[in-house]
Amino acid sequence: MQIYVDDIIFGSSDESLCESFAKCMSLEFEMSLMGELTFFLGLQIKQLSDGIFLNQSKYTLELLKRFNMDNSKAINTPMSTATKLDMDENGESFDQKTYRGMIGSLLYLTATRPDIMFSVGLCARFQSNPKLSHLKSVKRIFRYLKGTPNLGLWYPKSEKFDLIAYADADFGGCRKDRKSTSGTCQFLGHALVSWTSKKQNSVALSTAEAEYIAASACCAQVVWMKNTLEDYGIHFKNVSIKCDNTSAICLTKNPIQHSRTKHIDIRHHFIRDHVLNNNVVLEFIDTKHQLADIFTKALNEDQFEFIRRELGMLNCP
């Protein structure tokens, strides 16, 4: 159950339980039943016999109109692979309030649009002193949304309930401080349920270290999900975390300190404990099938669309 001010979402596989709960709540609060959930705080929910579809198409169209991008030319990716954003200290400044409004609005949209998570996060790093070069990248995101307003997440009905995760990192991608970006995502069966794109807190000295830190962050999320699911009587062992760097995988299995790892912050090493206790297992995956890649860098159109499909993103049925 989720409560937001005076809005309550509840559900059950047994309709009589829903009715019983609603009756109990009505005894304590003045309330009315709105029926099957179809809309909540900008989130559109379409419940079908073979699954559930989530999207924010109405919100997307409102954003395009609010920021005068509704007549813009559509484009196929939210960010070009040639884009290299930096502070652009000599560039022409742009209104900070407007820029922050655009970023904040786009961040809310990432609740159902993981395909723009990286590009929005990258542009968000320049909110303190936005330039026209940064605005250009933000407008490209809107142009991408112009061509894909109905995209959303599809959660198919399935008996498969495996917990699988993907972890990836670029290396020194931030041109300001050379820190890397971690990207992670987690699936329950075929359903994408969690994703992140976040700049790392320290500068990595190698690709392996950057990937190791990303895997550690992914492990933390997996452990939380695993513990939450155990409250519902669902237990997992050896949850698979997919990584495309063999050196990083080896680091999770080798507790010995040496020149390559002695400087890494101790909090990143907790993944070793969970590997040792068979809570998670890191498995190698080829880079072209690394789904977390979309959360670490701009991709070419073919790879971007492939990963987007694999994440379960479809047009509204």
Report residues per predicted region.
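Catalytic palm subdomain of template-directed nucleic-acid polymerases
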Residues: 1-30, 44-55, 91, 125-131, ...
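Active-site palm subdomain of RNA-directed nucleic acid polymerases
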Residues: 1-5, 9, 18, 28-35, ...
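Mobile genetic element proteins and their domesticated derivatives, centered on retroelements
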Residues: 6-8, 21, 25, 42, ...
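C-terminal reverse transcriptase regions that engage the nucleic-acid substrate
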Residues: 33-151, 286, 294
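RNase H-like nuclease module associated with reverse transcription
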Residues: 39, 162, 180, 191-192, ...
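Two-metal-ion RNase H-like nuclease active-site motif
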Residues: 105, 163-175
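Structured nucleic-acid-interacting core domains from mobile-element enzymes and related host factors
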Residues: 144-167, 234
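Acidic, metal-ligating active-site segments
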Residues: 174-190
